[in-house]
C-alpha cells in the first residue's frame, strides 16, 4: 500500500494474560522504529507530525501501562474503549489486574512495562515522541493510546514533552490526568472514543486557523484605530 512503511517486528503481541506481550529487546526495537520514522520524516522537511494508531483492544494494553506508570488501580484508568458493555468492561479490568499481578512490571523501567503489558503501537509511538525531541519536530498527541505513549516517552526522555502538542481529551478516564502530568492542555474536548489520528487532524486545522489569524488579521495600526487608553 502506497505510503505504508513496513517495520513489522512480529505478527502481533502475545496474550499478556498468560505471558509477556513481547520480549524486552522487541520493545526496544519497536521504540527505535518510532524514532527512525520521525528521523525520516524530518529529513524530508516535515516540522509537525500527528501521532495516531489503529487497532482493536489496544485501550486494554494502554490502560495496563497507565495503571503501572500512574500507580493507580486498573478500574480507575480503564474505560469502555469503542463501547464495551458493563460486563465486558468488568472482564477488561480483570484481565488488566491479572496481567499486572502476573508480570509485576517495573514502573521505573519503561521497556519492562511495555514488554510485559504493552503493545507495539505504544512502543513505536513512544519512539516517535522521543524522535520529535531528537530531530526538532512538533509532535501532536492524539487520543488515549497516544497520550500513554507520550507519558512513556517523557519517562524515558525527560523534557521531550517540550516538543508535544495536545489535541483533544479522550473520553477514556485518565487521559486528562496524563496530559496534566505532561504539562499539556488540550483545546478540544469532544468526548471522542477513538484515536487513529482523528483529534490530531482536527488540531492541525485549529493550528492553521490560529496561524492565519496571527499572520493575516489586521492590527489597529493597519486600520487606523487608536490603541486602547487607560481610563483614569
Where are these regions (language model features)?
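N-terminal loops that bind phosphate or other acidic moieties
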Residues: 1-232
